[in-house]
Amino acid sequence: MPVSDALPEDLSEVLRHLEACYPQEGCGVLLRAGPWGPWRVRCLPNAYDRYHAADPRRFPHSARTAFLFEPREWLALNREADARNEQIACVFHSHIDGVAVLSAEDRQAAAPGGIPLLPEVSYLVVNVERGQAHEARIYWWREGEFQDRGVPL
């Protein structure tokens, strides 16, 4: 499925999850069976604090300022998507009391060395202030860089 800025019309499940995770970053993925198939939201736990506790040098932040998928959850999600003939279309996460911008760390994680790890996947960032979603932007890789646009909430 070619990467695009497509999103489901109804983001309420995504927004509820991200608001419920406040004051930590929430995260998850949007899956889709082909470019015209139905969307499915899969909320995932933010495992960052567990990794920070085990290795604060390698994981210097907290779940308030960073997110990390649990590798076993990510593997299970990919197997589940394959079994359902779905593709991961979008990774979403929140920024807490800030702005809905794909940060330098987000960009580095998504495209280390300028090469996207998931070239067919877009990234939705939602700013959650005091437990309420306020702003969202979607990012996708095209022609060697991230493109973006605002997303109405």
Locate predicted features.
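Conserved beta-strand-loop surface patch within small alpha/beta domains used
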Residues: 1-88, 97-153
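Residue-level "edge-of-site" marker
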Residues: 94
